[in-house]
């Protein structure tokens, strides 16, 4: 098993995103938005994960810094499952819908400034349609119930105590 960090490392505390790769599967753990300023926000523009197979996404909790780049996966054509506890997925749905609305509104405001400065206009990071596409992929799994997250990857949520629905992921060898 190989684990790679895409976000929330190297001085960044937002943008939580890890790739777990085995011989059989490739899974993201969280897919969070970078927040904090122009430098941090610029990190949201590149692809969230290389254009390789992605079998599933596991969410540890619903905060934006753990879920906020999920709609980018929809823009990239991802249609696989996104697992989380029921409360995590409820929170993620609220946050992603609000974030999509804010992405569009903020982009419109920034594009007015760009237009006045003679700069090229940008698309919003994602739209409400992108958020809805990703929300259709959410798959709730309760605490303590073993599930097959991807080929060869079993998981169990345990209560992390961070917020309602937050979970640590156990990958037992004998589920």
Regions inferred by a protein language model and the residue ranges of each:
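Catalytic core of the metallo-beta-lactamase
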Residues: 2, 6, 16-22, 141-175
């Amino acid at each position: 098993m190989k684990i790679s960090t895409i976000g929330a490392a190297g001085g960044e505390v937002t943008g939580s995103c890890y790739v777990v790769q085995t011989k059989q599967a490739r899974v993201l753990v969280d897919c969070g938005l970078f927040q904090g300023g122009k430098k941090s926000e610029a990190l949201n523009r590149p692809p969230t994960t290389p254009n390789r197979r992605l079998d599933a996404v596991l969410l540890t909790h619903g905060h934006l810094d753990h879920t906020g780049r999920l709609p980018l996966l929809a823009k990239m054509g991802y249609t696989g499952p996104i697992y989380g506890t029921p409360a995590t997925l409820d929170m993620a749905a609220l946050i992603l819908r609000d974030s999509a609305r804010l992405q569009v509104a903020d982009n419109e405001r920034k594009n007015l400034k760009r237009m006045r400065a003679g700069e090229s206009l940008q698309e919003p990071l994602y739209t409400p349609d992108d958020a809805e596409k990703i929300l259709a992929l959410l798959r709730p799994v309760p605490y303590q119930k073993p599930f097959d997250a991807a080929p060869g990857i079993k998981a169990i949520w345990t209560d992390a105590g961070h917020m309602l629905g937050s979970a640590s992921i156990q990958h037992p060898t004998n589920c």
